[in-house]
Every structure is written in C-alpha cells, then in structure tokens.
Amino acid sequence: MTTAIIGTGNIGGQVARHLVAGGEPVVLAARDESHATALANELGPLASAAPVRQAIAEAEVVVLAVWLDTSKQLIVENGDLLHHKVIVDPSNPIQLDGKGGFSRTLPDEQSAASVIAGLLPADAPLVKAFGTLGAEALASSANRRPRRAVLFYATDDEAAAATVERLITTAGFDAVKAGGLSDATRIEVAGDLHQYGGMNGNVVDADEARVAVALAA
C-alpha cells in the first residue's frame, strides 16, 4: 500500500518521516514541487515525489496535510481521482490571527472534517487523523518509551479505520478511536481530546486516552 501525502510542511513532513521510518512507502506532493522532491531525497528509497494528481493516482491512502481551504480546493480539482481512496484529514479550522495565535474559521459546533466529508465522493471514506498533536509533539513523540503516545482518530468507516490504525501504529503511535465523524470536533484544536484543548498541552498514553474518550461519551 502507498500513502500519498499532499503537503510537506510541519504536519505532512513529520507524518512522512514517521511512516518511512516504520517501513511505509510514501509519495509526496506539494504546491512547490521542489519541496516534495527535497523531502523525498532526504527520506530515501521508500519516498518519491510527484505532482499532486499523479501522487493521488498512485496511492490507496491520501493524507491532505494542508490548510482547510487548500484541502477544499484540492478535492474540487481532483475529486475524479479520489474514488475508493481512504482520505485522511489532519486539518484544523483555524487561521493565524496576526497576534502570534490562531482563530477559528468555522462555528464552534462545526468540524473541518464535516466540511471535507461534504465534498468527497461517496465512495471515498474519510478519517480524521494525524492532527491531534501540535507539530513539535508530533515530531518528538513517535516511538515514545516506556508508554507510546496516542494519536486519536475519528471515522464512520470500519475498513478505513483499520487502514489508518495501521498507519498510526507504523508511525510510532498508539491509535485510539474518538468516535465517528460527528465526534471530530473533539480531536480538532480546542476540542477536549486535542493537545491544545482539553489535553492542556499533554501527550497522553493509551490508558489515559481511553479514559478521556469515555468521559464525554
């Protein structure tokens, strides 16, 4: 199985590094193709770079590691290639506020995942994942010992869940399901299961994560 990672910034780059370290082949794409090529060269033979449409076509899983508005544009432009792909959305509905912080771009009750899901083909299952930690923690917490760090995910599709659980494990984390896509706000920024929300900056292990999921279930 090949995973396409669209976007090679703070999140996409770290996801690519962790997957390759775990032996997973990836194909990278970025708005500036030189960035994808440079990262692929850094990561070695399990990584390649391609234009966006080629990367999507070559992969079974597509990670949209870009800002929400860019994800929306990518889906509109490449929807014909997304049929039967597992789509992974790590985005958060935020924007820079010009004061060193962030502000939400959606109403509090609306998730980025719900926006993405509404644009995807019906046969392209969506999994909210790889966005529950900040970039620094995502980079430093893979294969943590003695207790592995958790990445939460949410989806309505059991087959897609199994696929993404395997990728999370390969990347060096434990996977804990937060619920279906209706629960995605819990694992986006300011949600009770996000590092920069109810987790108060902490990176939890599997036991702590399951307790946290159950508290608001």
Where are these regions (language model features)?
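NAD(P)+-binding Rossmann beta1-loop-alpha1 motif at the extreme N-terminus of oxidoreductases
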Residues: 1-45
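Rossmann-fold NAD(P)-binding glycine/threonine-rich loop
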Residues: 91-142
